[in-house]
Amino acid sequence: MRDKVILLVEDNPDDEALTLRALKKNDIQNQVIVARDGAQALHYLFGTTGEHEEHAPGVVPQLVLLDLKLPRVDGLEVLRRIRADERTRLLPVVILTSSREQRDLVEGYGCGANSYIRKPVDFGQFVEAVRQLGLYWLVLNETPYAGA
């Protein structure tokens, strides 16, 4: 599980810290690349500006954890671009958001999300949600990008 890179797209520093803490608490030791807005996520995935020097062009993460309400480029547009590009169209994308809006849920799946998880307010419940997410997407699930 350790060699699979996770791209966390999250603009809220508190939610970023909670997500990283929940991953660590569940012994998910994968490298996590953090993009703090939609434009950074697209730059990481498609290598357009070199903002992420640790990223080798053409290397696709095993999983994207995507918030919806992002600056510069919103999460749904990031998802649309992921699905529109041949290099990333099969990339697992889990929307991890605090949005309670039904239209976000429907539009997220309509744009090609693989999963939609509402962030629990309780940290213990959030840790458990991250544990289950990690178990499924990083251990049980197989993607075309394995070993990439």
For the regions a language model picked out, list residue spans one by one.
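Short, glycine/charged-rich "phosphate-handling" switch motifs in NTP-dependent
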Residues: 114
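His-Asp phosphorelay/catalytic-motif detector in bacterial-type signaling
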Residues: 2-3, 28-29, 59-63, 87-92
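Residues at the ends of beta-strands that form strand-to-helix hinge/output surfaces
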Residues: 117-118
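Acidic, metal-coordinating helix/loop segments flanking the phosphotransfer/catalytic sites
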Residues: 18-24, 33-63
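Hydrophobic residue at a beta-alpha junction
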Residues: 70-73, 82
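C-terminal output helix
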Residues: 40, 121-134, 142-147
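Active-site residues of response regulator receiver
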Residues: 67, 97
